[in-house]
Amino acid sequence: MASGPEVAEPGDALIVNVGKSSIISVRDEDGAIRGFHNVCRHRGVRMSPEGARMSGNIVCPYHSWTYGLDGKLKFYEHMGEDFKPGCNSLKPVALRSIGGLLFICLSDNPPGDIDEMARVMEPYLAPHNVREARVAYQADLIEDGNWKLTMENNRECYHCGPN
């Protein structure tokens, strides 16, 4: 989904769309990275657009419901006496950092083999030291075209310069 350095400091957050789901990854005050669905539990409003960055609390733009970096509801208004804020935390997403890369699973029951995947991947990722990397520049290039052509174009060398 992303890399750990994209949420380098406590309070940093990154929003990424994965299929039809929008996910917020945040680094909490203890340095752990957490993942949540980018949907307010009040009226189902998407809290931030893809690519947005925020710092600190997660605030819904619709009615200002405010969530902490742990996903727990911190602020709300005009709810009945029987309202239970503890039952209205952000819905978590299984998130794991492996070698500095962030992996998510949207299933309510994530597969149990993530530890095996981490064991296999860590040695390959370790030489790249992704955990210490910093984003120096980012650009989006959007092209109209078939993705298969883009991939195939990079698999042969007809466009390489002569040696």
Question: What are these regions, as identified by a protein language model?
Answer:
Residues 1-32, 66-163:
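Rieske [2Fe-2S] iron-sulfur-binding subdomain
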Residues 12-61:
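Glycine-rich active-site/cofactor-binding loop and its immediate structural neighborhood
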